[in-house]
Amino acid sequence: MTNVVVVGSQWGDEGKGKIVDWLSERADVVVRFQGGHNAGHTLVIDGISYKLSLLPSGVVRPGKMAVIGNGVVVDPHALIAEIAKLAAQGVTVTPDNLRIADNATLILSLHRELDGMREDAATNSGTKIGTTRRGIGPAYEDKVGRRAIRVMDLADPEGLAEKVARILPHHNALRRGFGAPEVEHSTIMEELLSVADKVLPFRETVWLMLDKERRRGARILFEGAQGSLLDIDHGTYPFVTSSNTVAGQAAAGSGMGPGSLGYILGITKAYTTRVGEGPFPTELTDEVGQFLGEKGHEFGTVTGRKRRCGWFDAALVRQSVATNGITGIALTKLDVLDGLDELKICVGYKLDGVEIDHLPAAQAAQARVEPIYVTLEGWKESTVGARKWADLPAQAIKYVRQVEELIGAPVALLSTSPERDDTILVTDPFED
């Protein structure tokens, strides 16, 4: 038995929700370790769809403990709203099945407003990143700047007042620069104290709790959000998120040591998608790209934004295998490729006429690379609902084997529809 870390190996939206749900049924504890309510995922259980943004997937399954780690930035109002939405669907969330790290940073209204003001200004200047405007980046900035307000601060109104007084000069200076009105101390205090009684019952010393769970032999599932190519260090900077999204963050963002992480499962879509701005070497703007988007229902869970679509990029996933230490991948949405006459896989790039085997880190170079493709024959048969290798067309199996060879990691799971049971299991990550 081992613990499992689930990460996205592309730009997010790889289908982590289904795989995490499949794994969480067998886990005891499910931990979120980075990001905030900017990355959504949909779980389909017994025909009911649950859309989660902040809460760990384990929260919808009875008998599981869901944990929001210290690496997550928590919008308390979004948290309360998501809990209420689940309650309306018959899912009860209490401290018996959800704990939040007492040292997790809070997202405030001024973070959301700053995020929006920056995006508006960047849109006008042509430097837009394409954030969700939910205050994630500004909250992380305050965390790194050592002025953040954390979950535990809600329990001490007097100390909270001092911390609000410390954070406001920074934000009001920025707001003046954008021509926005300053924020009053009383506004933020009222905003926070109004949610304190609803948030504080969930607070926990998470590192200690997880250490106890580890010692008793609990199965722990670490649930990543977004994708490795959006990592603040290893992604396509500056078109990235504001946190580390690679597997190593599961340790730092939860308080467990790296030796406890175990199997690293990289969720990998059988083609490539991206939301928002930034480089995308294999992007297709033709009818094939439109086909992938429509058949794959490529619209964001949180924002509803249309995703950009393209061929599978083995060079980028190979980088993710290395930066995450991926043990095996879960290949998703293979069924979306059904019916295409031919398929292409990017194996490297040409940069100024020179062949290279990885995407360069420099933004200007990323904009100039041209993909180098291998072409494979497609298949006409349906792979939807396949649950064993024998159900797959020969060309589909050939495609999967080619992906494995090019990225340097084996397929542990193969997903053939949004339904959780439509999965071919090759290797059980919990038993590896």
Swiss-Prot record:
It comes from Allorhizobium ampelinum (strain ATCC BAA-846 / DSM 112012 / S4) (Agrobacterium vitis (strain S4)). GO terms for biological process: 'de novo' AMP biosynthetic process; IMP metabolic process. Substrate binds at residues 301-307. Pfam families: Adenylsucc_synt. SMART domains: Adenylsucc_synt. Belongs to the adenylosuccinate synthetase family. This is Adenylosuccinate synthetase. Mg(2+) binds at residues 13, 40. It is found in: Cytoplasm. GO terms for molecular function: adenylosuccinate synthase activity; GTP binding; magnesium ion binding. Its main location: cytoplasm. Transmembrane segments: none annotated. The keyword Repeat does not apply. Keywords: Cytoplasm, GTP-binding, Ligase, Magnesium, Metal-binding, Nucleotide-binding, Purine biosynthesis. It catalyses: IMP + L-aspartate + GTP = N(6)-(1,2-dicarboxyethyl)-AMP + GDP + phosphate + 2 H(+). InterPro entries: Adenylosuccin_syn_GTP-bd (IPR018220), Adenylosuccin_syn_Lys_AS (IPR033128), Adenylosuccinate_synth_dom1 (IPR042109), Adenylosuccinate_synth_dom2 (IPR042110), Adenylosuccinate_synth_dom3 (IPR042111), Adenylosuccinate_synthetase (IPR001114), P-loop_NTPase (IPR027417). Pathway: Purine metabolism; AMP biosynthesis via de novo pathway; AMP from IMP: step 1/2. Its cofactor is Mg(2+). HAMAP family: Adenylosucc_synth (MF_00011). Binds 1 Mg(2+) ion per subunit. Homodimer. One of its GO terms (cellular component) is cytoplasm. The active site is at 13 (proton acceptor), 41 (proton donor). PROSITE patterns: ADENYLOSUCCIN_SYN_1, ADENYLOSUCCIN_SYN_2.
